[in-house]
């Protein structure tokens, strides 16, 4: 899987928007414990009714512990924080390939919706150029990014811990790569 392909020009166009967190829906909820520059808990309401295949895969990976100790490898200020590379993104390992991998599970066909838009706190699935190549990586929006609508699958909304998302260490490398020690998802669980 290649890195999320987005124009660097578009990144600069978005400033961090203030806004309320989404209301918690029927779930399931993805609960992410974060350590590093950011410390705390992020709760994401997964939208099983919108993206059932993607939510099933995320839920399975979290239940298996695959997301535990995976870093936020790509973080672009005013845009998004990306994580979920369970193959190359484990803390303490060689992170030079972080963002290029996925899981041993099959890629998932796109589940686009016209009913939702990429806004602050929305969670989307990262993918390669093929819209049907999402696997394990996901990103959390710092600010609106409607240009992603119909291009990337929306899988959830942050319902608690947006202040933790806002504190995630920003990338300073090419295309938002985080140098030094990136923040890490120490434990990821699923709650009904």
Please tell me what each predicted stretch does.
Residues 2-5, 18-192:
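Cyclophilin-like peptidyl-prolyl cis-trans isomerases
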Residues 5-14:
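Sec-dependent N-terminal signal peptides
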